[in-house]
Regions:
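Active-site cores that bind ATP or allylic diphosphates and position pyrophosphate for catalysis
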Residues: 5-259
């Protein structure tokens, strides 16, 4: 077995860059035949068919119109898909795993990669769901249980995995959370200018100024995320921008492929 680690600029990037970087690593190896990924629908054929339709000129025009209405990209894609392709295609975009699957398929196509996609049906909790009592818990639910020191967190992991986590907790290196770094992050962000923020990946339309004002007034990361978020700029996007700013990741980093 071989485990490849996706470097930080791409591991905390938007779905498009995350998928492109991961697929490019596998493609560069020259020996990978199959790319499997979690999926809410579990149908490789349906995902491939819909992915091709999402790239149509009609869909692009419809998407542009939705974005011009001030919608976020995820919401705009879902609305455009419903208008151009029907409710079934729009429903696929509601699933976090299926939405990411489309980016994997797009990356495979752009690289002319011979790697074949394989969708694996996701069972149990949905992505980021924390209240699921049956089936496999989500990663978000497991993290929440561990942060609460809930014994159910240990039961949610294989014993060998939890032993590694227990060792890191004992050493003071885990669990990692925004709250543990909040003061350091806010302190660093307050030293940045709008020009610095303009260099961040996935920033546009003067968002750096809104982020800058939020940084100056917010007293916590939670309040920063809330005051910068709008209908167009999602909570997830603001969190990514904040993390990139703290780590010094710029557009120039994510525009490249992983080494």
């Amino acid at each position: 077995d071989l485990v490849l680690e996706l470097p930080v600029p791409w591991s905390c990037a938007r779905a498009q860059d995350f998928a492109r970087a991961g697929v490019s690593l596998l493609h560069a190896m020259g020996c990978v035949e199959l790319l499997s990924f979690g999926s809410e629908c579990g149908s490789t054929a349906l995902l491939c068919e819909t992915a091709q339709a999402l790239e149509s000129p009609e869909m692009r025009d419809c998407l542009r119109g939705c974005l011009d209405e001030g919608m976020s990209l995820p919401a705009a894609r879902e609305k455009a898909a419903a208008q151009c392709l029907g409710k079934e295609a729009a429903a696929l975009l509601q699933g976090a795993n299926d939405a990411l699957a489309f980016e994997y398929l797009r990356a495979l196509k752009s690289l002319h990669s011979p790697i074949r996609p394989l969708a694996v049906l996701r069972k149990g909790a949905r992505h980021d769901e924390t209240g699921c009592a049956e089936g496999f818990p989500s990663a978000a639910q497991i993290r929440s249980l561990i942060l609460q020191d809930n014994p159910q967190g240990e039961k949610s992991l294989p014993s060998f995995s939890f032993e590694i986590l227990r060792r890191e907790i004992t050493a003071g290196r885990a669990p990692v959370s925004y709250s543990a770094m909040e003061t350091a992050i806010l302190s660093h962000l307050r030293r940045l200018s709008p020009a610095d923020l303009a260099l961040l990946p996935d920033i546009s339309e003067g968002l750096e100024y809104r982020l800058y004002e939020g940084i100056r007034s917010a007293c916590s990361l939670g309040s920063l995320f809330s005051c910068v978020k709008t209908k167009r700029y999602t909570h997830a996007r603001i969190r990514r921008l904040t993390l990139h700013a703290f780590l010094g990741v710029t557009q120039g980093d994510t525009a490249l492929s992983p080494p």
